[in-house]
């Protein structure tokens, strides 16, 4: 076998008949497979051992030579070479065809490659190939033309007219082969280039396409006649196996049936030719042979597919590659691995953050080789075989060894669906009883796991390098921040939140209020003796906390806090600010002076006037974690997380929080609010009946009335809730539920959606505490079912979006430190009217500046050029009132096949600068795809009042943007910069005419009368600006403006969708995706370069071609940028392996073979496919060259590799 790590690139091409024969180890002559009595392969059949190799290791077919010592001997009785049976997976055979056949991919694909080379229509080709018409090969001196089609009758007439020697016409693949052999590629190319100079329209397009294919043949060295085959390769038998089922029947791969049909028809054709059978019979047999080969290569591509038993179409060679179950996606991009297990997960509240609980039976199986090695090393077993027996017997020694073996040996846990890279993390195993794996409660968020029966898979990293990577890069402690936004992903939830919320609550007049303690210990003692409560407000001497960052003045005073807050602050790092209120001021290190008693001030008087401080909610806990991570990094944060978890669980238990019917309080004002709403509705109905308003307006108003009523009830509810109400506490703390849940429990359910998706006018005025009427219950069921189906559809849509995103960006890797670009991206906050979508702070944090940022008031430098903006400087920029910052961006990066460190900025998952080798493309795709399921699926109607455009939102809008489709509810854009001269309505045609006067010319645009205008008369508008509300088509924007404007527009629009749903994604992820959509240009005028007009080309390749031409003194080519949707962009990649494994496999491979494409293996997918280590992370060439330094002599005795152990086990068992 070839060592995959030795080659740099992989090429594909057309196989010539000689090549096919050179691959083959022998000709398959008979359709037989296996003898049903002896179960041995038949001679000359599809499983022949002489051709494909022995079925048993080191043993010939007849059994004369057995054992490895005869390696390489060819048996003189049966003719089988003694070797490993594995060769039956790699040795090919072939079938010599009695008549040539065409390859269906090249004749039937779109466009038909054969048709383009011969300049014939696919229909004409089909008639020739399937023996319906003759084609003139050589007209001689008759008036016929070469390549002219003749029907049977015409042919006979012409023979009578001109005689049989005057011209030559044939049919079938032979005729096509002769035509293809007669094509003079160089001459055709020259003629076409001449033709291109004059041709226009349809003719030009056809010429460009023909020239493209012909040049591909010239460049690749493929011959056109190789599209017709004289011999067919037979794939190795172990790739099309035949296995015996119980009851003596056989299950076989469909390919064997397809090969059998070919061999049968081929043998029959040979016999007919030998017998000199009549032409029509031979012709029919040749046609059947052609159809059999078509079915073998791509069943169902032409005509009806060949079916097997039960009318199921047979799977041909093409189907073996295509789709999710095909070779690419099923076996090459994702494989099943050994040393793995799967089990139900259970909660492990006592685990440390880096640990997981591993059931003993799983541990014994997963770590078996390590245990065996250790048993032998300690002398507890004499050899590997004995060690194996001990494990099977579960001896006591085994468990002692197991403890030591799993210590310091991380394992990987994965939960499907793995939507982002946090779906696989490393943990240190701890042995637990039972059969369920234990998962740390804080790891649930990243995995999106719960314990209602979820299962997880476990994998053991075997080699030292793999263990080191798992420990240093993948340990759960390194996954505290989400790669999508840089916000903590391991925030406490549910019980942990409610526990800390309860602990930090304040209550007035609790027992022991106003007591003053020296330190925490004294306060705890008082609590244990029942003198104070967690919620009691007390004083404490600041001197008891010397490490906390108080001001000098504060240190001499007494601080007012609660006992619970003292406990809470005790778990924070020693030098972290004392948290007394849930504000960012306090978090940033400053405890407000109002919490300190002035000298001589009485604490009881102070407390009379002091307001109650709200407790710490989920969001604030998250902020604390982020702040600790920023200051103290990984270790301190993971320790803090465990402490928050333990404290939360303890205190939530002590709080005794329960929920009962009593906690759902009735609302006194509800009947009045509902009565008022009914009254308004009847008024509106009256107006409609009198014809004052339209039905649509009535509907809109009724919906509005009920929504207002529901909001009023909701607000009244919030105010009526007692702060100590358990339901309110759950919602307020962020532990579970939100206000709308409680409105439905205690207020009213409100309006429901009908099956059509429209909102029904009948509101549900009851709540769940009162109970619903039968009618209300029935109305509710629509919404409930719709919710379920929407979720299911959304998951599929979102998963497919992620797959396309990953495919388009998988080769984007950080490849260098600095690309040295001189361009940058000007950014400001993204707003929608007065609504803030994404603030400037979020957009500039962790990015490099392209230009120096100055303070607009003082002119001082805030951040110099080419420096990263960190939290402090970002805040300074915002505080100084800077509105626009020019930053380095992926949009303007010059790095090929990736981005540089400076254009990318900070790695969101670590908070540090990104490193060379980081697979930022994949991370970006996951970050955008993972929240896809949280986006809505709805296309909102903005209701006739506001104009009739539909705004697509949620997931469909994201897809629309990334696929650069024509948007729904499109906005017209102006092509000139100038002033809006007039807006005239034309009621007759129901249109508006907008006239814009530019500097050079005046343009008019026609819009429907219902369009809501963004501009009014006298407004100044830049070209590319939208005239009405709606979505701009990026393709138009690119035509009118430039690449950067288009990129910026898509970025803003994608962010708008996600931020509206409350999902924070860093700009850089979207930038990487959008950049991939705009990396191609279409050649307009080739100048003196070799490129063809109209072809798509990578921007980098285009620059290179132009650079070379200019150096040689030629005229450069001109091109215009094109925007491709992500699907198209993924298929247009330079890697044919990546494209073929994505979609349209046959089309991609057909095209790649004709062009003799070379895959440079720069992306991740193509390397995974061929089994090479991926060129990202530690697989980057720079890291692979590092050699370990020898320190002292090391003994390699007694060191086993896993494969050594497996070999030893095999040999022991054979012995």
Curated annotation (Swiss-Prot):
Catalytic reaction list: RNA(n) + a ribonucleoside 5'-triphosphate = RNA(n+1) + diphosphate
Enzyme Commission number(s): 2.7.7.6
Classification via Pfam families: RNA_pol_Rpb1_1, RNA_pol_Rpb1_2, RNA_pol_Rpb1_3, RNA_pol_Rpb1_4, RNA_pol_Rpb1_5
Cofactor(s) needed for function: Mg(2+); Zn(2+)
InterPro entries linked: DNA-dir_RpoC_beta_prime, DNA-dir_RpoC_beta_prime_bact, RNA_pol_asu, RNA_pol_N, RNA_pol_Rpb1_1, RNA_pol_Rpb1_3, RNA_pol_Rpb1_3_sf, RNA_pol_Rpb1_4
Cellular component per GO, a single term: DNA-directed RNA polymerase complex
Residues at which Zn(2+) 1 binds: 60, 62, 75, 78
Residues annotated as binding Zn(2+) 2: 819, 893, 900, 903
Keywords: DNA-directed RNA polymerase, Magnesium, Metal-binding, Nucleotidyltransferase, Transcription, Transferase, Zinc
Gene3D superfamilies according to UniProt: 1.10.132.30, 1.10.150.390, 1.10.1790.20, 1.10.40.90, 2.40.40.20, 2.40.50.100, RNA polymerase II, clamp domain, RNA polymerase Rpb1, domain 3
Cofactor binding comment, as recorded: Binds 1 Mg(2+) ion per subunit. Binds 2 Zn(2+) ions per subunit.
Positions that bind Mg(2+): 450, 452, 454
A biological process term (GO) from this entry: DNA-templated transcription
GO MF entries: DNA binding; DNA-directed RNA polymerase activity; magnesium ion binding; zinc ion binding
Quaternary structure (record): The RNAP catalytic core consists of 2 alpha, 1 beta, 1 beta' and 1 omega subunit. When a sigma factor is associated with the core the holoenzyme is formed, which can initiate transcription.
Family named by the database record: Belongs to the RNA polymerase beta' chain family.
Biological role: DNA-dependent RNA polymerase catalyzes the transcription of DNA into RNA using the four ribonucleoside triphosphates as substrates.
Matching HAMAP family: RNApol_bact_RpoC
Matches recorded under PANTHER family: DNA-DIRECTED RNA POLYMERASE, DNA-DIRECTED RNA POLYMERASE SUBUNIT BETA
Protein name, UniProt field: DNA-directed RNA polymerase subunit beta'
């Amino acid at each position: 076998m070839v060592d995959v790590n030795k080659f740099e690139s992989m090429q594909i091409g057309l196989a010539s008949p000689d090549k096919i024969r050179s691959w083959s180890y022998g000709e398959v002559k008979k359709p037989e497979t296996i003898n049903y009595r002896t179960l041995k392969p038949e001679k000359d059949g599809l499983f022949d051992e002489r051709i494909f190799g022995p079925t048993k290791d080191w043993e010939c077919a007849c059994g004369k030579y057995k054992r490895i010592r005869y390696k390489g001997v060819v048996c003189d009785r049966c003719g089988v070479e003694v070797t490993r049976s594995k060769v039956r997976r790699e040795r090919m055979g072939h079938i010599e065809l009695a008549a040539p056949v065409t390859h269906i991919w090249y004749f039937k694909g779109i466009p038909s490659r054969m048709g383009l080379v011969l300049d014939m229509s696919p229909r004409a080709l089909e008639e020739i190939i399937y023996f319906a018409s003759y084609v003139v090969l050589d007209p001689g001196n008759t008036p016929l033309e070469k390549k002219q089609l003749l029907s049977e009758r015409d042919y006979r007439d012409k023979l009578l007219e001109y005689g049989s020697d005057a011209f030559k016409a044939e049919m079938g693949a032979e005729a096509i082969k002769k035509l293809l052999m007669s094509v003079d590629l160089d001459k055709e190319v020259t003629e076409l280039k001449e033709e291109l100079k004059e041709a226009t329209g349809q003719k030009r397009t056809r010429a460009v396409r023909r020239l493209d294919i012909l040049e591909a043949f010239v460049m690749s060295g493929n011959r056109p006649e190789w599209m017709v085959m004289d011999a067919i390769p037979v794939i190795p038998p172990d790739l099309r196996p035949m296995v015996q089922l119980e009851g003596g029947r056989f299950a076989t791969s469909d390919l064997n049936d397809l090969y059998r049909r070919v061999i049968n028809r081929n043998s029959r054709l040979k016999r007919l030719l030998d017998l000199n059978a009549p032409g029509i019979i031979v012709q029919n047999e040749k046609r059947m042979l052609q159809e059999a080969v078509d079915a073998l290569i791509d069943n169902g591509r032409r005509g009806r597919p060949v079916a097997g038993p039960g009318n199921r179409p047979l799977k041909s060679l093409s189907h073996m590659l295509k789709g999710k179950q095909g070779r690419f996606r099923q076996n090459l991009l994702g494989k099943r691995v050994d040393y793995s297990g799967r089990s139900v997960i259970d909660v492990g509240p006592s685990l440390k953050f880096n640990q997981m609980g591993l059931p003993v039976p799983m541990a014994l199986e997963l770590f078996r080789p390590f245990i065996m090695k250790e048993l032998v090393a300690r002398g507890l077993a004499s050899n590997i075989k004995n060690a194996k027996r001990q494990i099977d017997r579960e001896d006591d020694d085994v468990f002692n060894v197991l403890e030591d073996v799993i210590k310091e040996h991380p394992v990987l846990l994965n939960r499907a669906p793995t939507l982002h890279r946090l779906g696989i993390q490393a943990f240190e195993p701890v042995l637990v009883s039972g059969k369920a794996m234990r998962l740390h409660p804080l790891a649930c968020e990243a995995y999106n796991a719960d314990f209602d029966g979820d299962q997880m898979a476990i994998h053991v990293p075997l080699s030292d390098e793999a263990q080191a990577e798992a420990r240093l890069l993948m340990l759960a402690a390194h996954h505290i921040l989400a790669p999508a936004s840089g916000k903590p992903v391991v925030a406490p939830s549910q019980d942990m939140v409610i526990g800390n919320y309860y602990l930090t609550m304040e209550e007035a007049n609790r027992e022991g209020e106003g007591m003053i303690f020296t330190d925490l210990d004294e306060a705890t003692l008082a609590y244990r003796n029942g003198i104070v409560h967690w919620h009691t407000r007390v004083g404490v001497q600041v001197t008891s906390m010397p490490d906390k960052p108080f001001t000098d003045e504060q240190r001499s005073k007494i601080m007012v806090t609660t006992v619970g807050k003292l406990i809470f602050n005790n778990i924070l790092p020693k030098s972290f600010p004392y948290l007394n209120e849930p504000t960012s001021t306090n978090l940033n290190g400053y405890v407000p002076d109002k919490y300190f008693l002035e000298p001589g001030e009485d604490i009881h008087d102070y407390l009379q006037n002091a307001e109650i401080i709200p407790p710490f909610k989920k969001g604030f806990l998250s902020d604390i974690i982020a702040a600790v991570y920023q200051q103290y990094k990984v270790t301190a944060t993971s320790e803090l997380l465990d402490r928050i978890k333990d404290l939360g669980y303890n205190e939530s238990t002590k709080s005794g929080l329960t929920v009962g019917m009593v906690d759902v309080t009735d609302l006194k004002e509800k009947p009045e609010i509902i009565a008022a709403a009914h009254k308004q509705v009847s008024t509106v109905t009256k107006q409609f009946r009198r014809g004052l308003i339209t039905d649509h307006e009535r509907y809109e108003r009724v919906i509005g009335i009920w929504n207002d009523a529901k909001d009023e009830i909701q607000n009244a509810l919030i105010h009526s809730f007692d702060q100590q109400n358990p339901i309110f506490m759950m919602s307020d703390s962020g532990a579970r539920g939100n206000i709308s849940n409680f409105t439905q429990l205690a207020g009213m359910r409100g309006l429901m959606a009908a099956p059509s998706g429209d909102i029904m006018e009948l509101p549900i005025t009851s709540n769940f505490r009162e109970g619903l009427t039968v009618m209300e219950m029935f109305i509710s069921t629509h919404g409930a079912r719709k919710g379920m189906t929407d979720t299911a559809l959304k998951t599929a849509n979102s998963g497919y979006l992620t797959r396309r995103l990953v495919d388009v960006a998988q080769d984007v890797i950080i490849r260098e430190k600095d690309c040295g670009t001189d361009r940058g991206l000007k950014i400001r906050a993204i707003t929608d009217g007065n609504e803030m979508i994404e603030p400037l702070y979020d957009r500039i944090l962790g990015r490099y500046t392209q230009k120096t940022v100055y303070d607009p008031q003082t002119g001082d430098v805030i951040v110099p050029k080419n420096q990263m903006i960190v939290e402090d400087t970002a805040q300074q920029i915002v505080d100084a009132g800077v509105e626009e910052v020019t930053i380095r961006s992926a949009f303007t990066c010059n790095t090929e096949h990736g981005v540089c460190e400076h254009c990318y900025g900070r790695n969101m998952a670590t908070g540090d600068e990104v490193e060379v080798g980081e697979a930022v493309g994949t991370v970006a795709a996951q970050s955008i795809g993972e929240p896809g399921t949280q986006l809505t699926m709805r296309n909102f109607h903005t209701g006739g009042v506001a104009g009739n455009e539909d705004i697509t939102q949620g997931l469909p809008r994201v897809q629309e943007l990334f696929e650069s489709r024509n948007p729904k509810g499109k906005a017209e854009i102006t092509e000139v910069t100038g002033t809006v001269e007039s807006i005239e309505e034309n009621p007759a045609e129901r249109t508006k005419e907008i006239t814009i006067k530019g500097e050079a010319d005046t343009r008019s645009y026609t819009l429907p009368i219902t369009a809501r205008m963004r501009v009014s008369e006298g407004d100044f508008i830049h070209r590319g600006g939208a005239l009405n509300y709606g979505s701009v088509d990026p393709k138009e924007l690119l035509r009118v403006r430039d690449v950067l404007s288009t990129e910026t527009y898509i970025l803003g629009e994608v962010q708008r969708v996600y931020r509206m749903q409350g999902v924070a994604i860093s700009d850089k992820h979207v930038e990487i995706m959008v950049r991939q959509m705009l990396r191609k240009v279409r050649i307009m005028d080739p100048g003196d370069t070799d490129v063809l007009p109209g072809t798509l080309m990578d921007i980098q390749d285009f620059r290179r071609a132009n650079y070379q031409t200019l150096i040689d003194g030629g005229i450069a080519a001109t091109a215009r940028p094109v925007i491709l949707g992500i699907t198209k962009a993924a298929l247009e990649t330079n890697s044919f392996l990546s494209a073929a494994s994505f979609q349209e496999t046959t089309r991609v491979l057909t095209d790649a073979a004709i062009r003799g494409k070379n895959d440079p293996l720069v992306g991740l997918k193509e390397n995974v496919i061929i089994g090479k280590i991926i060129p990202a992370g530690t697989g980057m060439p720079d890291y692979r060259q590092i050699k370990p330094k020898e320190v002292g002599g090391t003994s390699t005795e007694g060191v086993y590799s896993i494969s050594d152990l497996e070999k030893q086990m095999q040999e022991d068992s054979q012995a």
